[in-house]
Amino acid sequence: MNYLGINAIFHDPAAALVVDGRVVAAAEEERFSRRKHGKRPVPFSAWELPEQAMRWCLAEAGLTPADLDAVGYSFDPAIAAEMPDDPYDPVRVDYARRAPGFLAEALPGLDRDKVRFVEHHVAHAASAGLAAPSRTSSVLVVDGRGEAHSHLAGRYRDGELEILHRQALPESLGLLYESLTDHLGFLRSSDEFKVMALASYGEPRFLPELREIVRATGDGGFTAQAPDWTRFAPRRIDDGTWGGDHADLAASVQAVVEEVLVDLATWLHGQTGDRVLTMAGGTALNCVANSRIWRDTPFEEVWVQPASGDSGTALGAALHLAQEAGDLGAPQPTAAFGRSWSGEELAQWLRTAQVPFTTPEDLAGEVADVLADNG
């Protein structure tokens, strides 16, 4: 059976194709459009689909839209519609509700009734728990937001997800980190990795104050809302300089987020007793925090979905639909499911661009020599 997964709601639009339980193709729209993150994460972009990625996935497998048994869209507008006090969510929800029609228009031959909404964090969880080598694992999803939550903790048993805890919005470790990213003069929903790096240059001297507002609650949840950052450091203007209070603030937030994540994972282990923890969600891209979880929790193994951000929900949506149909396949063997090119194709493009090149027999040895010569 053939399942196409789609992420389009926030940022990093992507598509993934699962055939008979196995991932056969996956790609982010940015690889075709050459626009970083595919689009900006605003409600008014929710109608934009990963059209090129979808078509490439189908072509890679030799399928047409009519061959699809179902399409999974990694956001459920019915849940999001219940969120109060967000003036922009109705726009996003309206576009999401119309996704079946948008998809049928983008993929002629697709029956719009085959489009199914998969809850955002369930898609994240599936991208980890259904793709990992172990069929028995705990799963931890932490990001900015889904429809109404910012966190999911659960466990997988032979493909079945049991949800043990969710953290409701507005508490969100991901949105906390995004807010700090913006305060430090970087692009939110894009440059969080720069904040993680900046943290290594600072001292966590604001940690005691931050612990008062960002902390685990002991029941699998947490409190985390962005404070007035000017209490700690003025807003940074991106003028190429950094350090001082800004680096210390980054270090402090990184430290408190790590502490909460360790507490969440430890609580989850107490509920499941599993050897293996699988992770997904944008916060799982914080490799420094992941290393803390691996070192400081009882889990013996930690498996992080390589596409932990929202692009991975396309993969998760497809895997979730396949699992529901009893099409549970093999673990994800690689992250390299995207487009590739042959050596001859690359050579032809270089000739067209009149770029000189060589094809050494001992490629690794020659590259090593160049690197050794500071090349």
Describe each PLM feature range:
Residues 1-375:
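Short acidic/glycine-rich loops and adjacent helix/strand connectors
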